[in-house]
């Protein structure tokens, strides 16, 4: 009898939890039930970006792109955080500055014209100092690095900025998908996830 009572109580608890979960899902999806569809505020760059005319004239060999352009000026300093290996290809840690710091301060400019192609010499849409280092774990050892940026002001305090139409924030990631030769995996799946939930990060090709 004791085991039967315990088993019955267990199933009652499971049933109660299931009912609560169903109610939560119903409440969260109430707008969908009313309208019959979920409103998406997700910006899909590949579908919504305005086509740009080809540049008629600019300096010979000047870099020119229809994508947003981010220029990081480190003043010639190497960005720390690259993976180090020994002669037997064993991981030995990460690179640092001569002073032992694991990040440096640099200057960032973002060229993001809505009508024209972007060039390094264009007037920037956003300028800020940044604290930058190589990001990742095993990806630190890849030939193509990704970077973590913290936007700061002249006092070193957080400097949230809107970049490429995304919500303002002071922390950003430049992801270099070395193993994804299509360059589409993160862009595609972040956007698909963003259609299902608000917590998926925004993403742009640049």
Predicted features by range, described:
Residues 1-8:
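Short, Lys/Arg-enriched N-terminal segments with co-localized hydrophobic residues
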Residues 10-206:
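Phosphate-handling architecture centered on phosphoinositide signaling
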């Amino acid at each position: 009898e004791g085991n039967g009572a315990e088993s019955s109580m267990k199933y009652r608890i499971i049933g109660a939890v299931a009912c609560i979960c169903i109610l939560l899902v119903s409440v969260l999806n109430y707008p969908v039930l009313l309208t019959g569809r979920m409103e998406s505020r997700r910006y899909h760059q590949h579908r919504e970006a305005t086509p740009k005319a080809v540049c008629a004239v600019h300096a010979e060999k000047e870099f020119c792109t229809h994508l947003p352009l981010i220029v990081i000026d480190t003043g010639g300093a190497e960005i720390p955080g690259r993976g180090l290996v020994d002669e037997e290809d064993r991981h030995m840690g990460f690179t640092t500055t001569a002073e032992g710091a694991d990040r440096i301060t640099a200057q960032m400019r973002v060229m993001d014209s809505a009508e024209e192609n972007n060039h390094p010499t264009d007037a920037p849409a956003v300028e800020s100092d940044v604290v930058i280092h190589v990001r990742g774990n095993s990806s630190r050892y890849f030939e193509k690095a990704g970077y973590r940026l913290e936007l700061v002001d002249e006092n070193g305090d957080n400097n949230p900025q809107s970049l490429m139409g995304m919500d303002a924030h002071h922390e950003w990631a430049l992801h270099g998908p070395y193993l994804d030769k299509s360059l589409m995996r993160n862009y595609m799946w972040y956007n698909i996830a963003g259609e299902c939930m608000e917590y998926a990060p925004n993403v742009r090709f640049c």
